[in-house]
């Protein structure tokens, strides 16, 4: 009784959505992209194409890609700045990317450092947008959008944050490749400490009000 030894197709999802309750997800944006890739990198895979066609038939934009590492890093570079910094500032995307000082001191350096790590890991970053371009796009997309980043929503709801997935693993790769990441190290330490203190307060009954965190809406950050 199991799934067998079939190798799963890899999928990277770029979508703005909220977990209304366990098992129920609300899509909050008409722009939803699924990037599909075989572990082997075979962009001509019949099953990957069938999956893309099935998703497209359901109204979702789906693309078959040849290098999932490229897609994962592309998405990560969109999350590594505004997501953790939102926990420290309490601000939404529009407010943060519109703040010139914050962009120069934290947001842009985080993206540049992570991009340097990706390059050191063998990822072709030549076609990736620059840090400034990413932030400009984020600013444009955030206009009229009041949804806070997913890490901030998790923080406010008392749920575990994706600290390791978004920051910690990049830091581990940086150490392994010898790439300096001073901004990332500071932000990682601050966010981890904020999460720990927040959890301690909730355990002490100072911050949660007894509400079941699993029932609170959560936006799943999809690279924007």
Report the location of each language-model feature.
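Rossmann-fold dinucleotide-binding core
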Residues: 1-75
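Solvent-exposed, flexible loop/coil residues
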Residues: 18, 29, 72, 86, ...
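Helix-loop-beta segment of a Rossmann-like dinucleotide-binding subdomain
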Residues: 23-38, 89-99, 147-156
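Short, hinge-like loop/turn segments at secondary-structure boundaries
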Residues: 25-29, 80-82, 200-201
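NAD(P)-dependent Rossmann-like dehydrogenase/reductase catalytic/cofactor-binding core
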Residues: 49, 96-97, 104-224
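A short secondary-structure junction motif
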Residues: 58, 84-88, 194
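Short, structured loop/turn "capping" segments at alpha-beta junctions
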Residues: 61-65, 88, 95-96, 127
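Active-site-proximal catalytic alpha-helix in oxidoreductases
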Residues: 69-97, 102-115, 142
């Amino acid at each position: 009784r199991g799934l067998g030894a079939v190798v799963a197709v890899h999928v990277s999802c770029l979508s703005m959505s909220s977990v209304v309750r366990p098992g129920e997800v609300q899509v909050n944006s008409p722009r939803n992209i699924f990037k599909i890739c075989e572990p082997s990198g075979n962009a001509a895979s019949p099953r990957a194409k069938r999956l893309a066609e099935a998703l497209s038939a359901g109204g979702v934009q789906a693309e078959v890609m040849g290098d999932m590492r490229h897609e994962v890093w592309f998405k990560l570079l969109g999350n590594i700045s505004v997501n953790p910094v939102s926990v420290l500032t309490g601000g939404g995307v529009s407010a943060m990317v519109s703040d010139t000082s914050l962009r120069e001191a934290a947001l842009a350096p985080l993206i540049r450092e992570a991009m340097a790590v990706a390059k050191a890991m063998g990822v072709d970053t030549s076609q990736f947008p620059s840090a400034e371009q990413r932030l400009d796009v984020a600013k444009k997309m955030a206009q009229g959008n009041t949804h806070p980043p997913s890490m901030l929503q998790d923080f406010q709801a008392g749920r575990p944050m994706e600290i390791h997935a978004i920051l910690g693993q990049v830091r581990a790769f940086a150490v392994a490749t010898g790439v300096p990441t001073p901004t990332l190290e500071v932000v990682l330490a601050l966010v981890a400490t904020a999460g720990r203190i927040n959890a301690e307060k909730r355990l002490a009954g100072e911050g949660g009000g007894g509400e079941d965190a699993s029932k609170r809406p959560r936006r799943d950050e999809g690279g924007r």
